[in-house]
Curated annotation (Swiss-Prot):
GO annotation terms (biological process): isopentenyl diphosphate biosynthetic process, methylerythritol 4-phosphate pathway; terpenoid biosynthetic process
One Pfam family of this chain: YgbB
Catalytic activity: 4-CDP-2-C-methyl-D-erythritol 2-phosphate = 2-C-methyl-D-erythritol 2,4-cyclic diphosphate + CMP
EC number per UniProt: 4.6.1.12
Species assigned in the record: Blochmanniella pennsylvanica (strain BPEN)
The UniProt record lists the keyword Lyase: yes
Positions that bind a divalent metal cation: D9, H11, H43
Role description: Involved in the biosynthesis of isopentenyl diphosphate (IPP) and dimethylallyl diphosphate (DMAPP), two major building blocks of isoprenoid compounds. Catalyzes the conversion of 4-diphosphocytidyl-2-C-methyl-D-erythritol 2-phosphate (CDP-ME2P) to 2-C-methyl-D-erythritol 2,4-cyclodiphosphate (ME-CPP) with a corresponding release of cytidine 5-monophosphate (CMP).
Protein name: 2-C-methyl-D-erythritol 2,4-cyclodiphosphate synthase
InterPro entries registered for this protein in UniProt: MECDP_synthase (IPR003526), MECDP_synthase_sf (IPR036571)
Keyword Hydrolase: no
GO molecular function, one term: metal ion binding
Quaternary structure annotation from Swiss-Prot or TrEMBL: Homotrimer.
UniProt cofactor(s): a divalent metal cation
Length: 157
């Protein structure tokens, strides 16, 4: 059985948290506003994985009203969600992620991001595709007010 999941996340710049994408700290003059570490890649990926497995969403699994998730490393959340999903017999076929931001450029960090995901999901980096794009200065992302990420996953069981 094939199962497809789709995830989306967005965070506003302007907070005091460092910019973390895919578990990698990215130098940036603007911080992120968030309850956890604000890692849009991890958050959208968790939502995609949970969606494919029909296990709800990141907000119900890790509510921002629960203090134990304040400042938490989203890689830990990914590992917890993935353990729940694999206990149901799901296997990961592939991941396709698009990070949408005007600044900073992240292409030089993509290999590190893929490596983190492959470690956390116990899969090959060849099963993971990450790309970055801009909005050509349009909208809140184009004005460098925020960052967004879309993740699509294919699971089998």
């Amino acid at each position: 059985m094939l199962r497809i999941g789709y995830g989306f996340d967005v965070h506003q710049f302007g907070g005091c948290r460092p910019l973390t994408i895919g578990g990698v700290s990215i130098p940036c003059m603007k911080g992120i506003k968030a309850h956890s570490d604000g890692d849009v890649m991890m958050h959208s990926l968790i939502d995609a994985l949970l969606g494919a497995a029909c296990c709800g969403d990141i907000g119900s699994m890790f509510p921002d009203t629960d203090a134990k998730y304040n400042n938490i490393d989203s890689r830990k959340l990914l590992r917890i969600a993935w353990e729940k999903i694999t206990m149901q017999g799901f296997l990961l076929e592939n991941i396709d992620i698009t990070v949408i931001l005007q600044i900073p450029k992240i292409n030089t960090y993509i290999y590190q991001m893929k490596h983190h995901l492959s470690q956390d999901l116990n899969c090959s980096v060849t099963s993971i595709n990450i790309k970055a794009t801009t909005t050509d200065t349009l909208g809140y992302i184009g004005r460098s007010e925020g960052i967004a990420c879309i993740a699509v996953v294919l699971l089998t069981r």
